[in-house]
Design a protein with these regions (language model features):
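Conserved helicase NTPase motor core
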Residues: 1-4, 34, 42, 61, ...
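Amphipathic alpha-helical transducer elements in NTP-driven molecular machines
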Residues: 40-43, 62, 66, 87-91, ...
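P-loop NTPase Walker
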Residues: 1-80, 180, 234, 263-266
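ATP-hydrolysis module of ASCE/P-loop NTPase motor domains
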Residues: 57-59, 77-163, 186, 254
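Conserved coupling/interface region of RecA-like P-loop/ASCE motor cores
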Residues: 78, 223-281
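Conserved AAA+ ATPase "sensor/coupling" helix adjacent to the nucleotide-binding pocket
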Residues: 50, 96-100, 264-272
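Proline-centered turn/helix-capping motifs that create local helix->coil transitions or kinks
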Residues: 107, 124-127, 212-213, 268-278
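Residue-level signature of catalytic and energy-coupling elements of molecular machines
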Residues: 8, 39, 64, 94, ...
């Protein structure tokens, strides 16, 4: 099911109520339900609201994409928190690479941050490094930087947050038995803020959903904010190309904003033609 949830329409409530419905009305084992969102704070708050609503502990998994995928890698490769590259390790690695390649810059921290951002974008987009053109340095130089950064992580048995996605996808592609085990564990998948999903996150979700296709996604294509990290709201726009039988529901009442704000926002966003056409009304 695809739920188009406008601003202030109760996205979190929809997710928690749907989860409650699966357990109480459909008899689904709570341990087979996976709820994913984009920030740790959001996942924690959603879990708190759900547990309060249930008035008892339920073993539903609430987490971010990275937390869920890292848990999968922990089982497969015996990773621990020590295997996650710390920021200071990543920055020191980049300083050494920059010095080795004799790269020039105005501000070291900004330059390193920008390079790491580009490396992250390449990983999250799933594009070949040979097809990426850097904004910070010549293409051949960037490829050297990218390769040396990867080698540093590999030699030290470290992964960064983007590797959590890349390695999980590779694991599922290479080990059908492991994929089947996780498909059996998480038979029902609910995703909040789906408009901010990126290509590799979505590829993994499709593999997890498998033939059961028990996906319940909630989002608003008008509110995508993570394009700089590879988010692709067009994935949501074309969701029904992958799941043509999915039902679409529109939550069209904004309970947060007054009428003139809702009307003005609707007029502005209406100029964007690459979106779901929808009209949002104010509650009052």
């Amino acid at each position: 099911m695809l739920v188009l949830a406008g601003p202030g329409s109760g996205k979190t409530l929809v997710i928690t109520e749907r989860t409650k419905y699966l357990i109480e009305e459909c008899g689904i084992d709570p341990a087979q339900i996976l709820v994913i969102t984009f920030t740790k704070a959001a996942a924690t708050e959603m879990k708190r609201r759900f547990q309060r609503k249930m008035n008892r502990l339920c073993p539903v998994t609430f987490g971010t994409f990275h937390a869920v995928y890292f848990a999968i890698l922990k089982h497969a490769y015996n990773y621990s928190a020590d295997n996650i590259a710390r920021e200071e390790q990543r920055y020191q690695c980049m300083r050494e690479i920059i010095a080795k390649e004799h790269l020039t810059y105005e501000d070291e921290t900004e330059f390193i941050t920008s390079l790491l951002g580009e490396i992250s974008l390449v990983k999250n987009s799933g594009i070949e490094i040979a097809n990426y053109y850097s904004k910070n340095c010549a293409e051949t130089v960037f490829r050297k930087v990218y390769r040396q950064y990867h080698e540093f992580l590999y030699k030290n048995r470290l992964i960064d947050f983007d590797d959590m996605l890349v390695y999980t996808k590779e694991l599922f592609e290479q080990r059908a038995d492991i994929l089947a085990a996780w498909q059996n564990k998480y038979r029902y998948i609910l995703i909040d803020e789906f408009q901010d999903i990126n290509r590799i996150q979505y590829d993994i979700i499709k593999m997890l959903a498998g033939k059961r296709k028990n996906l319940f996604i909630v989002g608003d294509d008008d509110q995508s904010i993570y394009r700089f990290r590879g988010a692709k709201p067009e994935i949501m726009l074309h969701f029904k190309d992958d799941y043509p039988e999915a039902e679409t529901v529109l939550l069209d009442v904004n309970y947060r904003s007054v009428k003139n704000i809702v009307t003005s926002a609707g007029y502005l966003i209406g100029h964007n033609k690459e979106r779901f056409q929808k009209k949002i009304e104010a509650a009052g």
